[in-house]
């Protein structure tokens, strides 16, 4: 196990507990291990931090450990849920670490059902899943070797989308997790490692290109575990500073943890951090050239201390992140178009095409300059014609800079599927027709996935059907679904339906058998009587002499006696 996801509580604002100590030590001893925790759902509680209700209410000392990741609950549009627990940690450190969607998340229930849930317990596994994707990316880039978890935490924190006050804060931590930005850091090798001892300095050279809108630089280290109930959990204290080409020096973000609600809600400033085991420097519109990041071993009683430095360079480019191609959208539904872009002074223009870019249609020509999403009502029709297309794309433009879906996606309605019957030998599936569909793909649950069973060409009727051979006659129940297709583009599958065999309504497969009566006369005429079962409806007799019959009980005359 290298990534865990856990959402249990253990006290509110419990401080640096023995469990926090154990987890910090465990992560330090197992270099690839990452523990992800929910921050808690006590956002409105007063847990004794000293600032009243709404602050210092992370639910468990283990979630306040230095080397773990604690996750806040965000809505679909990146707002903090009111119930999401907030920092600081008991000693003033930044918690939670990052946020992710945890509001109105669909999840499974017993008896093959779903429901919607809200809480940091829903956000936490999302972050663990994001970590798994980044771990896999690192392995593919580095000879299938697991990454060091201190690097991965540094990547995730430094690439998060800033929310709330500029820089880190005690509500959102370092922002909303952004896997695409994290992947970019790994793919472009925008990280370095170092090792430092008491009182020493280490320099890292960074070349910042022209046109950079913002640079974020972070240094993170898995800190040695502190003693249980330590008033200050940080053991090895590193400090960073950034020197520009002109010689000016920038210090990292710091927050004031004074137990006062107004102070805790104050934006971060730049200064010296002696509480946290991560430090970040942000510069907007930096002068291009060579920068020097200096890491100082201010207090390293247990050295040498390994650390990682990551940097993220943001330009004026726009990256459309959804829809990017291959999706199946439904006419009339709302979809969040999403993109990554650095703040600018120009609004965005959003457009869509349903004919592979021949014609573009305005969605909105004045989307806010700081927006990164737009709630789009997928069109039901265009110029009075119902929309059913496999040639749709979205385009976003700002001040002459543009990006669009990497490939076409499909817009088509969803059929309503049901199973008429399922028998040991065959299955009969029916569904409602969809406007504009050229054909339909019928799927059945295999060992892991919904496997395509057949494709049925649209017949133009209001209902469609498929008769399938049953590949699993001994399975007690099966799951089926259908999606509409427009040429090669697939729409969304209908929610799968469960069907169980009902042998009482299934006809048994016919088994051929017959009885031969004695010859009626010396002429060789023989009477055959059908003795088959399974409700046969058609017969084909072969008398062995080149003659056949379609009668149920035929008579046949042989010229000479012979075996039949």
Residue ranges with predicted function:
Residues 99-166, 293:
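Hydrolase catalytic cores
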Residues 377, 383, 467-472, 552-564:
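Solvent-exposed segments in extracellular or luminal domains encompassing
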Residues 339, 425-437:
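Conserved aromatic anchor
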Residues 468-491:
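Beta-strand-rich modules
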Residues 502-564:
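Extracellular/lumenal mature domains of secreted and surface-exposed proteins
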Residues 1-66, 90-93, 107-126, 224:
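Substrate-binding/access-modulating region of protease and related hydrolase catalytic domains
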